[in-house]
Amino acid sequence: MGKNYAGSQIQFENGKEIETPTIQGELERALRTLIKTGESQRNRPIKTIFSGRTDKGVNSLGQVVHFDTDRTIVASKFIYQMNEILPDDISVDNLRIVPDSFHAQKSAKARYYRYELINRRYKQAFDGDILRVKYELDVERMQTALNFLLGEHDFSSFKSSGTLNPSKVCFITRAEVEKLGDRVFIHLEGNRFLYNMVRTIVGTLLEIEGHKLPIEHMKKVLEAHDRRKAGQTVSPFGLTLMKVSY
């Protein structure tokens, strides 16, 4: 759960680690507790590498992390011990020994994100921080608009200024809208995603719905390669990294 953390990655300022809770910070503290540094690791502290960066408030059910160690680890025992040390809102679900060539980020072939919306006029006690849309969403219109994003495109219109990779080209293999009761889920899967790309796509969908713009507006925004043409970047609450494929 990402609500109580300043994102997945340890934060630095002027070369020094900022004292703020992060998923990476909690994982590395737990690892240091469990793994006694061997002779070959004295000058190489345990460092975790994530499959991708998530912001404050973003949840993850499928985050993949790798680290190097020269110690022998028994998976079932290690998972139990890690989860005993970690805070209640972070857990390790699986552990595998991988080849030295494996890299959690660079070896990834696809990432699947899901954004959850509440489509209801009135709030309820257990809504939490999930974005609530008061007007009725037309799922068929939303799906047609999302279809313009399938395939390989330059997604510059949907990036935020924090995007570090110079390439803005992504290949989207899945873009679906699903409605279950008063919940609407946007499913997006692709080889890579730009910073805040999913949240801005959702914001553009809501702009199309809220202002009753033609569904072709999504195509125009995509082809403009201009962030100013897209909708707002919606709240991180409701966004979940569901799966990373290798």
Descriptions of predicted regions:
Residues G2-Y246:
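Structured-RNA-binding interfaces characteristic of tRNA pseudouridine synthases
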